[in-house]
Amino acid sequence: MQRIYLFSDATGETVERVVRAALTQFRNVDVKLHRMSRLRTREDISISLDEAAKQPGVIFYTLVDNELAQYLYNEANLRQLEAIDLITPLLYRLASLLGIQPQKEPGLLYQLNSEYYKRMEAVDFTVKQDDGQEPRNLHKADIVLVGVSRTSKTPLSMYLAHKGYKVANVPLVMGIEPPSELYQVDNSRVVGLMIDAQRLVDIRTARLRNMRQNPRGSYADYQRVEEELDFCRRIYRKHPQWQVIDVTNKSVEESAAEILRRFETGIKD
């Protein structure tokens, strides 16, 4: 059996993936990988090298600190261990190509992965909370959007979710009381969406035509739309601590930016 030691100043996932990818090119080999992670001092490196020297094997390492990388290489030689640097040559070449120096901060890839999984978790939550689904989970949302149909609740929710926010949206339907769970949410997390009546009529009419349905029904009737918006306003007035955003003629990006600005600054217009 051959032993391979994986030395890293972070989690060791990067060096292990590279080595495992290379090993797939070799069939029927008996290899054992030993991961030595978070080696950020000379003492850490020396202890790990002493451990590796007990059952010698080749060392592959990814240390972004040049001094530590050189120390590892020298100390490995003293112990008659072969050590191969997987990242320093790449960093030097990229620095030359890009014209800037690397940050040399351990664990950045792991941090990026953590941010990615946070966004995916937010997206998963948001999909499950779309259009008033699972109101029992409203209290878990970072942001709760409320408004009548076709005020961009779903597109806004998904846009914010991809920025890492868990978002729920609740439709406000005239004559139907919103779920009681909505009123148990921290008021500062709730955003009411408003829109110009004629603009909403135009959006709904276009929607009906796209679905090949009659655009002359009550769904796109101006008087009916005005009544729905009045219903919204009454609910918003009962909850003055909610943020209210006018989405008329705004892109999803613009509306999302305003929502986040309000949240970050605590401004209430």
UniProtKB/Swiss-Prot annotation:
Its EC number is 2.7.11.32, 2.7.4.27. Pfam families: Kinase-PPPase. InterPro entries: Kinase-pyrophosphorylase, PPDK_reg. GO terms for molecular function: ADP binding; ATP binding; phosphotransferase activity, phosphate group as acceptor; protein serine/threonine kinase activity. It is an enzyme of class 2 (transferase). ADP binds at residues 147-154. The keyword Nucleotide-binding applies. It catalyses: N(tele)-phospho-L-histidyl/L-threonyl-[pyruvate, phosphate dikinase] + ADP = N(tele)-phospho-L-histidyl/O-phospho-L-threonyl-[pyruvate, phosphate dikinase] + AMP + H(+); N(tele)-phospho-L-histidyl/O-phospho-L-threonyl-[pyruvate, phosphate dikinase] + phosphate + H(+) = N(tele)-phospho-L-histidyl/L-threonyl-[pyruvate, phosphate dikinase] + diphosphate. Keywords: Kinase, Nucleotide-binding, Serine/threonine-protein kinase, Transferase. Belongs to the pyruvate, phosphate/water dikinase regulatory protein family. PDRP subfamily. Bifunctional serine/threonine kinase and phosphorylase involved in the regulation of the pyruvate, phosphate dikinase (PPDK) by catalyzing its phosphorylation/dephosphorylation. This is Putative pyruvate, phosphate dikinase regulatory protein. The lineage of its organism: Bacteria, Pseudomonadati, Thermodesulfobacteriota, Desulfuromonadia, Geobacterales.
